[in-house]
Amino acid sequence: MFDIGFSELLLIAVVALVVLGPERLPKAARFAGLLVRRARTQWESIKQELERELEAEALKRNLQNAQQVIHDAQAQLQSNQQDMDIQNSISILHEQTKRDIHPDHDTNTLEPSTAVHHVHVPPPSTSTHGNNGQEKSQ
């Protein structure tokens, strides 16, 4: 954590022994250990809180991204629905136009047996027409 080597730690111990003396050195070492332990605990606490905050921010971003995707999908779905409605309207208009231009053959056709009518045409009379279809003069 502090990147202190063995030789540096030994130097600090010798200076502490000279300054504090052999009677107060164990008490000072315990106090220093307590301070280091508290500092580490505080550091870990801050680190965990930061990680939770970062995780919460990541979740918030993911939620916003998911909401944006849902919003985009809803807009696309609505656009597709409008396209389908327009396509259905065009199809209906197309069918109506076809019926108007070409009347439905099912309602205007008759059965073949009833569709044929026998019409009697009288033969031409000989008194009014000549050989070549000209009128006779009297």
Swiss-Prot record:
This is Sec-independent protein translocase protein TatB. Pfam families: TatA_B_E. InterPro entries: TatA/B/E (IPR003369), TatB (IPR018448). Belongs to the TatB family. GO terms for biological process: protein transport by the Tat complex. It comes from Xylella fastidiosa (strain Temecula1 / ATCC 700964). Part of the twin-arginine translocation (Tat) system that transports large folded proteins containing a characteristic twin-arginine motif in their signal peptide across membranes. Together with TatC, TatB is part of a receptor directly interacting with Tat signal peptides. TatB may form an oligomeric binding site that transiently accommodates folded Tat precursor proteins before their translocation. Residues 116-138 are annotated as: Disordered. The chain crosses the membrane at residues 1-21. It is found in: Cell inner membrane. Keywords: Cell inner membrane, Cell membrane, Membrane, Protein transport, Translocation, Transmembrane, Transmembrane helix, Transport. Coiled coil: none annotated. Residues 126-138 have a biased composition (Polar residues). Signal peptide: none annotated. The Tat system comprises two distinct complexes: a TatABC complex, containing multiple copies of TatA, TatB and TatC subunits, and a separate TatA complex, containing only TatA subunits. Substrates initially bind to the TatABC complex, which probably triggers association of the separate TatA complex to form the active translocon. One of its GO terms (molecular function) is protein transmembrane transporter activity. It is a single-pass membrane protein. The lineage of its organism: Bacteria, Pseudomonadati, Pseudomonadota, Gammaproteobacteria, Lysobacterales. PANTHER family: SEC-INDEPENDENT PROTEIN TRANSLOCASE PROTEIN TATA, CHLOROPLASTIC. GO terms for cellular component: TAT protein transport complex.
